[in-house]
Amino acid sequence: MRYLTAGESHGPQLTTIIEGVPAGLYITEEDINFELARRQKGHGRGRRMQIETDRAKITSGVRHARTLGSPIALVVENKDWTHWTKIMGAAPITEEEESEMKRQISRPRPGHADLNGAIKYNHRDMRNVLERSSARETTVRVAAGAVAKKILAELGIKVAGHVLQIGSVKAEKTDYTSIEDLKRVTEESPVRCYDEEAGRQMMAAIDEAKANGDSIGGIVEVIVEGMPVGVGSYVHYDRKLDSKLAAAVLSINAFKGVEFGIGFEAAGKNGSEVHDEIVWDEEKGYTRATNRLGGLEGGMTTGMPIVVRGVMKPIPTLYKPLKSVDIETKEPFTASIERSDSCAVPAASVVAEAAVAWEIANAVVEQFGLDQIDRIKENVENMKKLSREF
């Protein structure tokens, strides 16, 4: 499976075309809109979320709530477009109109794509860069992830994302009993954190950063349960599932690091403290006594829960902007200010969940069948049976 997205932050709409979804999958616009609404929540979001109420429209690839096997097209309208029709319109304008155009940007923001993208594409108005590099694009990535989650749900595979850290505040309580328990608590949390006390401290940290004109980052975790053994490959580097998951997480705006299981803690431990002992269970077959490697060994799933974390840097748009240089005058100035969040970590956990779900669904569909969801279900069950009886 694959998908492409198109659209600018303040353009008329965002679009994604999803190819390779098996036929027969039940999905509705409401399934997708549920995930889009989750992305828009979270303490620390900016005024844009008060304007937009994202709703996806399926324009092809689905008939009577069942996928056809042909490409699925989804569009999400930008309600703020009415204020940007002149500035972001596709119609030609005169040089005089261009010179008088408001909101042209010549002062790049440190930490953003502005300057590098402007040099790459020779844009004198860096709005041409920031409109596409904006995290607004993650709206349709979450829409694609919603389709992937429907595939996984058919196969008994569950996915959940949550927040472990915002700023210096870390969640201490993570003793959830199941993915359902984790979701039940985090869906009610303004910062998507299982630890309620840590969640209150996280909100205070976000408020403090906002009051100071600053931004704040954090760490999110995604857990996948119900995976069959052997998804992925050890044969080639580009078929290892952990490499694909790492790329997916790092492709999210502002994410700068990724780890699995105990992750970077492994550097300070002996091998006996890192690797998971193999045990036999009459019901489950081969399993592990621990899950320090996060459900992945040799680029393949072990059947244990996949545990992947990503670190998100603070958003680079600051209301107390850093120093920069005007590309027209070459004089020092403070960077441009765009409407932005002070913290997007809670929303980013939903985006990370979607990104991980997509890669998992893609790997499962590729390995167990491409065309029909019922055939894939049968093949997955056969693989689980083989694993138990091996």
UniProtKB/Swiss-Prot annotation:
EC id: 4.2.3.5
Keyword Nucleus in record: no
One Pfam family in the UniProt entry: Chorismate_synt
GO biological-process terms attached to the record: amino acid biosynthetic process; aromatic amino acid family biosynthetic process; chorismate biosynthetic process
Pathway(s) annotated for this protein in UniProt: Metabolic intermediate biosynthesis; chorismate biosynthesis; chorismate from D-erythrose 4-phosphate and phosphoenolpyruvate: step 7/7
GO cellular component: a single term: cytosol
Any GO MF annotation of the entry: chorismate synthase activity
Reaction catalyzed: 5-O-(1-carboxyvinyl)-3-phosphoshikimate = chorismate + phosphate
Enzyme class: lyase
Binding site for NADP(+): R39, R45
Gene3D superfamilies, alphabetized: Chorismate synthase AroC
UniProt cofactor(s): FMNH2
This protein's UniProt keywords: Amino-acid biosynthesis, Aromatic amino acid biosynthesis, FAD, Flavoprotein, FMN, Lyase, NADP
NCBIfam families: aroC (TIGR00033), PRK05382.1 (NF003793)
Role: This reaction introduces a second double bond into the aromatic ring system.
Family in the record: Belongs to the chorismate synthase family.
Name by which UniProt lists this protein: Chorismate synthase
